[in-house]
Each structure stands twice: as C-alpha cells, then as structure tokens.
Amino acid sequence: GRVLEVSIGPGVNLPYLVGRADVGEIYGLDISLGQLKRCREYVAHQGWDVQLQLGNAEQLPYQDNTFDGVFHLGGINFFNDKKKAIDEMIRVTKPGRRILICDENEKGAQAYERVIPGFKRIAGKLRPAVVPPTDLLPPEVREVRLFNVWKDWMYCIEFTKA
C-alpha cells in the first residue's frame, strides 16, 4: 500500500520500508529543507522511488483518505499544535488503516539532556514533562495501544482510523 512518513528527516527509516511486500508507494514529508535535501541525496544514491515533499505536519498537503499507513517517529513533542498534526495524520489515512506516532518519553528526554549538548537549551530549561499525547486522539479512533520502545526512551501510540 501507500505509506507516508511525517517528518522523514534524512530518511533513516526508509530501509525498513523499501522492498517490503506490503509497501507499494512511499511518501515522505518534512518541514526542513536541509533534511529533505539529505533525504533526496540518500534516496538517489540508493536508487529508491520515494516521493518527498516539503511541508508542515499540521497542514499536510495530501487529499483525505490517501494513505494505507501513516507514521511519525520523533518530533511531535516540539510541534506547535500536536492535536492538529494528529488530526491531519488521521485525515490523510484511509479508514480502517493504522497510524503510528512515536517520540521520546520523559525518560528519553532526561537521557538526551545528559548526553546531547544543547538538547536542554532546545527543549527549554523549564520544559513541561513529556507525556504521550493520547488525550489528543479523537474518540472515534479504535484499537489504541501505547507502548515504549528503544530502551524505554520512546513512547509509541498506535491506533486505527475508524
């Protein structure tokens, strides 16, 4: 099917998609022109067919019910309007299909503050505690699952569009 990665960055997740029998067309969107440039170079070097687009997760430039799967790995904690981004991911997903949203949890954020120079400054000195945004999911989504991955440093919210 047709899959969209929101905030594709340099394309580090693409090797997990390319060549899978259940993945046909791959789309990627990022707000950063620099990240998209790196991703385009990576995709060209690998010889992959990936449709890349500059855009904002809070206003996805795709038609309703376009994708068989949508995922976002990292970044939603810094979005201006998390609810709008989640609503947009739902909007562009076909009914009955899955959406996956992951980002660092509080444990991960604290670890990043210890090991990544400048992370605390980026996140803000008095940043609020990181809480998975399950409260922002609309009531009509189904099969909501919240779990941790990557040494329990990241949360993942997986659900199905009604």
Predicted regions and their residues:
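Class I SAM-dependent methyltransferase SAM/SAH-binding core
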Residues: 2-59
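A short acidic, Gly/Pro-enriched loop at the edge of an enzyme's catalytic core
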Residues: 58-70
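A generic alpha-to-beta junction signature in SAM-dependent methyltransferases
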Residues: 20-21, 79, 93
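Short glycine-centered segments of the SAM/dcSAM-binding site in methyltransferase folds
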Residues: 2, 97-98
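A short SAM/SAH-binding and catalytic strip from SAM-dependent methyltransferases
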Residues: 68-81
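C-terminal alpha-helical "lid/dimerization" subdomain adjacent to the S-adenosyl-L-methionine
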Residues: 100-158
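Short beta->alpha hinge that forms the Motif I/post-I loop of the SAM-binding pocket
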Residues: 30-31, 81, 104
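A short glycine-rich, Lys/Arg-flanked "PGG" loop and its adjoining helix->strand segment in the class I
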Residues: 83-95
